Amino acid sequence: MELLNGVETLVSGIHHHHRTNAKRNRLVRSVKILNSGNHEIPRKCLCFDLYDKLVPYKKAWSWQKSIVEEKKTLIDRNQDCADTVILLQHSPVYTMGTASTEDYLNFDIKDAPFNVYRTERGGEVTYHGPGQLVMYPIINLRNHEMDLHWYLRMLEEIVIRVLSSTFSIKASRLDGLTGVWVGNQKVAAIGIRVSKWITYHGLALNVTTDLTPFNWIVPCGIRDRKVGNIKGLLEDGEHGMVDDLRLIDIVHESLLKEFSEAFQLQIEKQTVSDPNIL
């Protein structure tokens, strides 16, 4: 199986961290609701919406980095650049962050069940696969908040709002751990990288994901907690069974809505012009 070393000398992404009381008590910046009395114009965000496609991880990774470089070039020229968000699913793959070691793999890396990529994002090892919605915001934090902890909390907040507003599922953060949890189950993993205040990598939300491949790793380096998905939570609750494809559609719509509101962005759908992406 392919092992790719992709560590770059950029600003480190953050995955696990310990929060001080001040950080823990700090509220996520409130969202401004645009209405007739609010004349602030939201910034444009180019959206490559491939949520119903399986995109190979290596292609999406290279794509992100090329967009980051384009934005950095514009910034160096003192030109404005729109934010970007990519939404997709991946073919089955394991990715390792900057904190990862092979101790968290329950298999010989030379005989891995899927490709394994060592990346420059923060955090440990995780799995991506069909039924998991992956969101890669590539945004200029100079236009938002130049604070990586704030950015991580905002990504968590987006998922928490999706679960609450769409399914009335109460999700939460856990002190000292990055991600989103429902009870003892982690439903969303987050790992980022930032270069000159341009973000990439992002969040992965388990919707209908087959959870079996998580058994072959120690997800995010956490041994004493489970991984869950929205489908399982709904089956355990009062909502009952929901068709897999319909569930993906519903979560996708909610995810984009909450993302645009949280970061005050106007989503503009784009067409993927590079046939090599798919």
From Swiss-Prot:
GO molecular function: lipoyl(octanoyl) transferase activity
Active site (catalytic residues): 220
Sites where the protein binds substrate: 121-128, 189-191, 202-204
Cellular component per GO, a single term: chloroplast
SS bonds (residue pairs): none
Gene3D superfamilies referenced in this protein's UniProt entry, alphabetically: Bira Bifunctional Protein, Domain 2
Disruption-associated phenotype: No visible phenotype under normal growth conditions, but the double mutants lip2p and lip2p2 are embryonic lethal.
Residue intervals of the BPL/LPL catalytic domain: 79-267
Pfam family for this entry, one: LplA-B_cat
Entry-linked CDD domains: LipB (cd16444)
Reaction(s) this enzyme catalyzes, per UniProt: octanoyl-[ACP] + L-lysyl-[protein] = N(6)-octanoyl-L-lysyl-[protein] + holo-[ACP] + H(+)
One GO term (biological process): protein modification process
Lowers pKa of active site Cys (site feature) positions: 186
Pathway participation: Protein modification; protein lipoylation via endogenous pathway; protein N(6)-(lipoyl)lysine from octanoyl-[acyl-carrier-protein]: step 1/2
Transit peptide residue numbers: 1-19
Protein's cellular compartments: Plastid, Chloroplast
The enzyme's E.C. designation: 2.3.1.181
Summary of the tissues where the protein is detected: Expressed in roots, leaves and flowers. Expressed in cauline leaves, stems and siliques.
Keywords, comma-separated and alphabetical: Acyltransferase, Chloroplast, Plastid, Transferase, Transit peptide
Matching InterPro entries: aa-tRNA-synth_II/BPL/LPL (IPR045864), BPL_LPL_catalytic (IPR004143), Octanoyltransferase (IPR000544), Octanoyltransferase_CS (IPR020605)
Leftover remarks: In the reaction, the free carboxyl group of octanoic acid is attached via an amide linkage to the epsilon-amino group of a specific lysine residue of lipoyl domains of lipoate-dependent enzymes.
Function: Catalyzes the transfer of endogenously produced octanoic acid from octanoyl-acyl-carrier-protein onto the lipoyl domains of lipoate-dependent enzymes. Lipoyl-ACP can also act as a substrate although octanoyl-ACP is likely to be the physiological substrate. Together with LIP1P is essential for de novo plastidial protein lipoylation during seed development. Acts redundantly with LIP2P2.
Family (UniProt): Belongs to the LipB family.
Name of this protein: Octanoyltransferase LIP2p, chloroplastic
Record lineage: Eukaryota, Viridiplantae, Streptophyta, Embryophyta, Tracheophyta
